[in-house]
Amino acid sequence: MIGELPLTEVLSLPLEVFEHDYMAIKILSPEVSARIAAGEVVERPASVVKELLENSLDAGSTRIRIETTEGGIESISVIDNGRGIPEVDVPLVFKRFATSKVETAEDLEAIETLGFRGEAMYSISAVSEVELVTGVDNESTGSRLVARDGEIVEQSFIAVNPGTKVKVTRLFRNFPARRKFLRTRSAESGRIKTLVHRYSMIRPDVAFELIQEKSRPFSTTGSNDIRNVMSSVYGNETANQMLQVKLDEVLRDWRGPVVMGIMGTPAQTRANRSHINIFINGRWIQSKTVSYAFEQAYHGFMADRRFPMGALDIHIPVEDVDVNVHPAKTEVRFRKESDLFGSVQHAVRNTLLQLAPVPSASPRGNSQRQFNQDHVPATHSTFWPTSIGSIPKSENPNSDNTIIRPGHLEVVDYADSVANRQSHTPHG
């Protein structure tokens, strides 16, 4: 290769040599660029379900039905009762970078919707065939579109109820290599089911229904009761024992990270991290920082090599989180990561301390703190921001209500955690 020769020899070479060694820069064709973009957004059937679910939730839907066949590889349908798409906007649905959620660059600094990139529908249609039927309240007819290879191939007007139905068929029909790397149909179905579980946890006010191969493995009522959702996911016995995390009334004016949700007791451990669900401002994310804070809060309460379970709903100012990191929108960056780490750890830790005695000394080691499984109140306040001056007291009736100091809490320092979590993965 020319690059391996000394400069003096390179200068003496004839020009014909360079013609064969130089790779000219070319502008990618629309077809190739579409496939590259689609590959980042649509990795597997569950990716399609995720994008369609987020569109439905952003549209204000209160009922969402998901139907799949062959693990979503042959067909995926998502039907909602949301606002629908006005006739004037329908032709733009499958255009790349077309969205109703962002207008200016400043909007990217304060994103409040689940979707915002304007790539989902375009990317899905680039790797499958998509049929969209939609209607709105104030229009007499709705619209039907069929898109293929990123282009609309059919369009008509039909009578339809308000809401939207999207049916995706023959996923990766022109991508045999991508189909080859998909897992079994049952494994892909499992990924979709897990995804629907997650969205139902963060939106208990929405009724979800999942139909797979004509069976209904999962549904929720939309009653806005997180414990009812957990009953649908894990069963009544497990859900009834879980601990609910709520914001204390005295902290309503707090402007830092607010941690709420539901979590398992120390007896409800799992063999891996796949049952740790983290949501930031209603968005499911993967975060080593938050996951590690959640785990470390259980230190001393459960055995080593076991992992907690639960769903934490964390709210922070939108300007303190950057969700525009990756097209999949599951990776985010935090402006005040240490504050978030501390708030999560204190919220979870204090929940556990309300249910277990606080010893006068709490040596580190493999010992497991005794947990009172019978004392599980239906609701209790647990959030405690790290910057508030006063120190929480134990509300366990079995304790002497002494002040819980950092030595008792065994709270892991944020700086130490950064070093300790180098090999940590959020879901394993």
Label each PLM-derived region with a short phrase.
Residues 1-22:
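N-terminal amphipathic/basic-hydrophobic helices that include classical n-h-c signal peptides
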